[in-house]
Amino acid sequence: MHIQSRFAHITTPKGTVLVSHGYGEHSGRFTALTDALVEAGYDVFYYDHYGHGTAEGPRATVDVGRLIRDHVNARRIVRAHARTTDIFLFGHSMGGLITAASMLLDPTHLRGTVLTGPAFRPLPDIPASTVRKLLPLARLMPSLPATSTSIRDGESVLSRDPEVQKAFDADPLTWKGGTPLLTGATMILQGDEVLRRADQTTTPLLIFHGSADKLTDLKGSRTFVSNAIAAHPDADIHLRVVDGAYHEVLNEPEGPGIIRDIISWFKQH
């Protein structure tokens, strides 16, 4: 795991943010966010998940449980090198699931967490009970395609802006094939586990989710927030539904405003 960083050009940063990218992509797709964070006075750390981007491993084929453990370890490394004790987490899609799971495993040393389109319930929605029966096969044949279609098939699924999908398709570091069985199965099971443990959430949390997301189910975010607030009615936990937005809310027309909202939320915490 190769963790990279960008430091704000001030002696004392306002905070430190660890950014976690989604399935099939890489950390370089979050330049707009990291640029804005650095400009606002935040130090930013990021890395490519195993099997993604420039990281080692078979392409997009990984047990998501490993990625969660990697994230917990990355947080320890970030704390050791951070110029401030104010640590924030950001995660998108699968990275949102990983970030939430990491937060639940170790809620210490965190000022707050922001997620966009977290993969608590990846689409199409397959019951966890069914997936558990497939797990032995997934470990035996991890690269077996779980889906017959790629993210490129048909209309844009990432953003209402077709240029976002075109850029993804042209990017040599993104994965365009179907979801490998091991990745898909463990993502669903980890999402189910995170939703089951949502009532343990006490860390300040803000989730953005597009109402027209075709890759991760908005119901997953609603369930997480509902369960967390039911257990802790006074908790600082909120869901903002972005009307009409697809999966990558930061790459929608509302994206610049959402980035400003994220920075404002970090400042408040």
Locate predicted features.
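Active-site glycine-rich loops that stabilize anionic/oxyanionic intermediates
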Residues: 22-25, 211
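Catalytic nucleophile-loop/oxyanion-hole region of alpha/beta-hydrolase
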Residues: 24-27, 53-82, 86, 258
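Conserved alpha/beta-hydrolase
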Residues: 34-58
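Alpha/beta-hydrolase-fold enzymes
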Residues: 94-179
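Short beta-strand/loop motif that positions the catalytic acidic residue
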Residues: 201, 207-209, 213
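Short alpha-helix in the alpha/beta-hydrolase fold that links the catalytic acid
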Residues: 203, 217-227
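Acidic catalytic loop of the alpha/beta-hydrolase fold
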Residues: 212-216, 248
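Catalytic active-site module of serine/aspartate enzymes centered on a nucleophile-bearing elbow/loop
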Residues: 231-269
